[in-house]
Amino acid sequence: MKDYLVKALAFNGEVRAYSVRTTNTVSEAQKRHDTWRTASAALGRSLTAGTMMGAMLKGEQKLTIKVEGNGPIGPILVDAHANGDVRGYVTNPHVDFEGTEQGKLRVYQAVGTEGFVTVIKDIGMREPFIGQSPIVSGELGEDFTYYFAVSEQTPSSVGVGVLVNGDDSVLAAGGFILQIMPGAQEETISFIEERLQQIPPVSQLIEQGLSPEELLYEVLGEDKVKVLETMDVQFNCTCSRERIESVLISLGKAELEQIRAEEEETEVHCHFCNERHKFAKEDITSLIEKL
């Protein structure tokens, strides 16, 4: 099954909802970065949340999420675009903790329970929107829920999950974001709160084969949900040899000549996708000739 995202309304517009399957997306990230189990869960949850938050944007808009906790995994960075493209990495991919709690990996031990979630939105204005909130649990779903409440004043529930096999491969990943609209009735809010207490973990529902639509039906009730739009999502990095050439050219002639004199081969590493772009002396020479 391919990865895709659903945008919906529920309870006659009282609730805005997003749901996504990110199994292939998170699996691609796991393979590229060789993340171990707990690191895979942390990165996967962040990618899943970022994918849905990116889908809240329009056109060429994009956002960057930075999760900086005090755990051994180090900072997590995610870039997400309005078109469904997402990329991301963890600073220390080889982090794992044995055992589980309530059937889930101990993500909070990897992320840490102190620190900040920062979201930078590039929405085409002169200055980006920057929102920040403290980490409240390190489990990430709760941390993004708190971010929406504190930084965007939007009562929300963020559920994100990743199931990882013993060989570190990704079995299932996905999530949902529910946002309460102004004027929502107390009965609606109470119903959602009760349902969220009753449903199994998101990753288990996706492993069972539930689609993004069915995930929303499970939480909100099929008769309450009106699907507005679906869109494909995927791990896709914006780095390319051409873009890196532009960056190298921007260094200027003097610095490029110094690089050519000192290095037999220049390697540029993209942290987001882990690709390594190599430039031989003659490649640097051709760049200098363009100046």
UniProtKB/Swiss-Prot annotation:
InterPro entries: Heat_shock_Hsp33, Heat_shock_Hsp33_C, Heat_shock_Hsp33_N. Its main location: cytoplasm. The keyword Kinase does not apply. GO terms for molecular function: protein folding chaperone; unfolded protein binding. SUPFAM superfamilies: Hsp33 domain, HSP33 redox switch-like. GO terms for cellular component: cytoplasm. GO terms for biological process: protein refolding. Disulfide bonds join 237-239, 270-273. Gene3D superfamilies: Hsp33 domain (3.55.30.10), HSP33 redox switch-like (3.90.1280.10). It is found in: Cytoplasm. Keywords: Chaperone, Cytoplasm, Disulfide bond, Redox-active center, Zinc. Under oxidizing conditions two disulfide bonds are formed involving the reactive cysteines. Under reducing conditions zinc is bound to the reactive cysteines and the protein is inactive. Belongs to the HSP33 family. Redox regulated molecular chaperone. Protects both thermally unfolding and oxidatively damaged proteins from irreversible aggregation. Plays an important role in the bacterial defense system toward oxidative stress. PANTHER family: 33 KDA CHAPERONIN. This is 33 kDa chaperonin. It comes from Bacillus mycoides (strain KBAB4).
